[in-house]
Design a protein with these regions (language model features):
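Short beta-strand/loop motif that positions the catalytic acidic residue
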Residues: 2-8
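Active-site rim elements
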Residues: 59-70
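Short, hydrophobic alpha-helical segments
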Residues: 76, 80-85
Length: 85
């Protein structure tokens, strides 16, 4: 299972998620659309983190980090249920 954000400017989807998935048996790729970037998959930051490292902590206004985390969890659970028998 490989997940990535369509707006990832750190590691572009074409040279990372899709590239690596081509070499991973049974890989399933999910690209979150829109403004989902590289750091959205990190845990929520504290106030101090947002003040110190805003690039890691602040997402585009259209991105709901908690929703991305929940969807990624659902995808992982389903993937492992199918492939770890």
């Amino acid at each position: 299972m490989v997940v990535a954000g369509a707006a990832d400017a750190i590691v572009p989807v074409g040279s990372s998620a899709r590239f690596y998935a081509a070499y991973i048996p049974h890989a399933e790729v999910t690209i979150f659309p829109g403004d989902v970037g590289h750091y959205v998959f990190l845990a929520d930051c504290t106030e101090a983190g947002r003040a110190t490292l805003p690039a890691l902590c602040l997402d585009a206004p259209s991105v709901d980090r908690d929703a991305i985390h929940a969807k990624t969890t659902d995808l992982a659970e389903a993937y492992f249920a199918r492939h770890l028998r």
